């Protein structure tokens, strides 16, 4: 079974296709017929040691102080402070609609996210993995997305949609890590 997580990179972002979600897959009683079972494998080294570092955990949540509508398919969210973290998106939209959540610390003169101060050394080979930009494909139902494999530095989030969509300050929350 394909995962809804279709790409992840700790340095850039996560791409998520909500159309591939399987309700209850992580709960007891889920019918996993056709799934492969976990298999025991050899250790990659003789001694396995845990990482000696503090865990990355949620420490605070922030609601947007402003959700500025740029046009029918683009919004810019302003959060009260610059954080290291992720955003939690809760939205319902047309099935197959692609949202891009571009996280940054600055705005340009037009009020759009400017990443000139943080993507200085980023050299992509194509447009498939934009820097600090989560990509979410909507299922047509009520969708919830929060990245599990990365975090970003940001105070502003530019949400652009492949089709017109209605968003408000309640659709996106900043989660500090």
Predicted regions and their residues:
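Extracellular/oxidizing-compartment recognition motifs
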Residues: 1-177
């Amino acid at each position: 079974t394909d995962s809804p997580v279709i790409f992840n990179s700790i340095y850039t972002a996560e791409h998520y296709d909500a159309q591939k979600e399987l309700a209850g897959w992580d709960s007891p009683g889920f019918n996993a017929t056709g799934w492969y079972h976990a298999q025991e494998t050899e250790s990659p080294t003789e001694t396995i040691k845990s990482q000696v570092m503090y865990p990355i955990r949620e420490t605070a949540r922030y609601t947007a102080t402003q959700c500025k509508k740029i046009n029918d398919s683009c919004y810019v969210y302003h959060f009260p402070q610059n954080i290291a973290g992720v955003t939690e998106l809760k939205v319902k939209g047309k099935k197959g609609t692609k949202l891009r959540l571009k996280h940054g610390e600055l705005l340009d003169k037009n009020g759009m996210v400017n990443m000139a101060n943080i993507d200085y050394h980023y050299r992509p080979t194509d447009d498939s993995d934009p820097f600090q930009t989560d990509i979410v494909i909507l299922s047509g139902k009520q969708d919830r997305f929060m990245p599990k494999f990365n975090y970003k530095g940001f105070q502003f989030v530019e949400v652009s949609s492949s089709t017109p969509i209605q968003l408000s300050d309640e659709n996106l929350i900043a989660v500090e890590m």
